[in-house]
């Protein structure tokens, strides 16, 4: 047993050597199970403090690491840093700014713009609350400058965190090679590792010119953050959460906004109550929702863009119309995986028909030693999901936690619409499909939040609880209204823990709040 303290100390950082000494006496009292000794030695040896990287490889040499991460977005960075904490020699390949979509052209700058839009909405309520009306003109350039500066600070923080973790940043595009063991090439140099993670994310989808002539005249959500001024006239195409968020922001800030959707409701994959209510709230807020409509052609004119569309209401003849003088045409029709230039075929890495990398529940691809997390996998395209999956993977690979994997069930999500949406678990239709209609019961409510008790402007708050089986286990919660974005997290914990309707009923309400409705549903 005396060998075990030495094994714990060998190659470990100072903190782990101190821990080994502290437990020496305790360990000497233990029996001598060889399997336990080997497992502890291996685990402690890997959990050493991050060490500085060695010198760069000589020209023509192949640099070797314990862990190579392709993609410096949220999932890749989280996985690399956790691996480094566990003692792995890691490197991240990135060709653009650190932080990926979320930090640079997604969640973070979008939330800044959403906050700006919410501020604009509340300004309309000032007089109702006894303050003089605020007639100040919105200055797009001011918030753009502050937003971009904030993003730049986050980029620097990511850079600093990698440096502190002794993780090397390899700048450039990575592509797999045909070498005998998994190898990538970046700017003419080769790098290899027994474990390679693909975390390249996704990018906005746009129609091809052959499908819609002039489609390239529009922008995507990426381009939204490059706009130098507020568009006077905006047309958003799409019915998903990005389309809903962009339309809400632009409209609230003063752009005349149309949202073009192929069916009659937005967010059709959400619970039907949310889909219906969100569509109504958009219209109530002044967004023109063009239902059963699609863009046919886009032309550039002296006064902006001319968007031709066809509206095909079921049971009626299609009608062609044109929207003139459009300043901003924004495509929000989905996202595609960023795998085009990775040369996945050289290793035979399998993808689905949309290009998403196919992985199992442990994030393994079909090629040993190659893994994928995040949007590139096409499942639950959310930053916290990529981060959690990446960290779980690092623990499995470098801490020998063989069962470490992300549970993709009951993942909460928020749509920053106006008002915001919060949802976790199964929709009513999904619950019926899983448990049978006779085993599903729903509880719902609709009310005006107290904030609007004295305002001319009104928004609703709607809530639905989906319960299953005799014990009425809560399998889904869906809500839209003021504050729903912030109140969901706690209720998501309850759903994840398997709470029942009775558990909610036995919780004393907080009054007066909107959240109390979920513990008083009847």
From Swiss-Prot:
PROSITE patterns: PYRIDINE_REDOX_1 (PS00076). Its EC number is 1.8.1.7. InterPro entries: FAD/NAD-bd_sf (IPR036188), FAD/NAD-binding_dom (IPR023753), FAD/NAD-linked_Rdtase_dimer_sf (IPR016156), Glutathione_Rdtase_euk/bac (IPR006322), GSHR/TRXR-like (IPR046952), Pyr_nuc-diS_OxRdtase (IPR001100), Pyr_nucl-diS_OxRdtase_dimer (IPR004099), Pyr_OxRdtase_I_AS (IPR012999). Keywords: Acetylation, Cytoplasm, Disease variant, Disulfide bond, FAD, Flavoprotein, Hereditary hemolytic anemia, Mitochondrion, NADP, Oxidoreductase, Redox-active center, Transit peptide. Changing residue 374 to A: In CNSHA10; decreased glutathione reductase activity; decreased enzyme stability. Binds 1 FAD per subunit. It catalyses: 2 glutathione + NADP(+) = glutathione disulfide + NADPH + H(+). This is Glutathione reductase, mitochondrial. It comes from Homo sapiens (Human).
């Amino acid at each position: 047993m005396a060998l075990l303290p030495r094994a714990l100390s060998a190659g470990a950082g100072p903190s782990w050597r101190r821990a080994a000494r502290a437990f020496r006496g305790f360990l000497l009292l233990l029996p001598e199970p060889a399997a336990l000794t080997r497992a502890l030695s291996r685990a402690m040896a890997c959990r050493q403090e991050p060490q500085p990287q060695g010198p760069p490889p000589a020209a023509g040499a192949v640099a070797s690491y314990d862990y190579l991460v392709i993609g410096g977005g949220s999932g890749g960075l989280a996985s690399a840093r956790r691996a480094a904490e566990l003692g792995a020699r890691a490197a991240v390949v990135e060709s653009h700014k650190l932080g990926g979509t979320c930090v640079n052209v997604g969640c973070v700058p979008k939330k800044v713009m959403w906050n700006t839009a919410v501020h604009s909405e509340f300004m309309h309520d000032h007089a109702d609350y006894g303050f003089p009306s605020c007639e100040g003109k919105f200055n797009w350039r001011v918030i753009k400058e502050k937003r971009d500066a904030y993003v730049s600070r986050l980029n620097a923080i990511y850079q600093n965190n990698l440096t502190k973790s002794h993780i090397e940043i390899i700048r450039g595009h990575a592509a797999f090679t045909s070498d005998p063991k998994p190898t990538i090439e970046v700017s003419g140099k080769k790098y290899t590792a027994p474990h390679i993670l693909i975390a390249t994310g996704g990018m906005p989808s746009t129609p091809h010119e052959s499908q819609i002539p002039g489609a390239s005249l529009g922008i995507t959500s990426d381009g939204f953050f490059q706009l130098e001024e507020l568009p006077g006239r905006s047309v958003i195409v799409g019915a998903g959460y990005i389309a809903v968020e962009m339309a809400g922001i632009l409209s609230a800030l003063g752009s005349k906004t149309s949202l073009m959707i192929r069916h009659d409701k937005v967010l059709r994959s959400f619970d039907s109550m949310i889909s219906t209510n969100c569509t109504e709230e958009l219209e109530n807020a002044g967004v023109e929702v063009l239902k059963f409509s699609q863009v046919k052609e886009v032309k550039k004119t002296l006064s902006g863009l001319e968007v031709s569309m066809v509206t095909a209401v079921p049971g009626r003849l299609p009608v062609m119309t044109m929207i003139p003088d459009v300043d901003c045409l924004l495509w929000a029709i989905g996202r595609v995986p960023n795998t085009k230039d990775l040369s996945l075929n050289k290793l035979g890495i399998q993808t689905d028909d949309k290009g998403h990398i196919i992985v199992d529940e442990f994030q393994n691809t079909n090629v040993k030693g190659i893994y994928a997390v995040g949007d590139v996998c096409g499942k639950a395209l959310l930053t916290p999901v990529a981060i959690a999956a990446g960290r779980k993977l690092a623990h499995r690979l470098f801490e020998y936690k063989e069962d470490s994997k992300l549970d993709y069930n009951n993942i909460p999500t928020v749509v920053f619409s106006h008002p915001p949406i919060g949802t976790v678990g199964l929709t009513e239709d999904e619950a019926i499909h899983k448990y049978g209609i006779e085993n599903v019961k729903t509880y719902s409510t609709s009310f005006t939040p107290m904030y609007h008790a004295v305002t001319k402007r009104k928004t609703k708050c709607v809530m639905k609880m989906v319960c299953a089986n005799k014990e009425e286990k809560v399998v889904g919660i869906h809500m839209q209204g003021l504050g729903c974005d912030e109140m969901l997290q706690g209720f998501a914990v309850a759903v994840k823990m398997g709470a029942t309707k009775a558990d909610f009923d036995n919780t004393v309400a907080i009054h007066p709040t909107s959240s109390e409705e979920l513990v008083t549903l009847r």
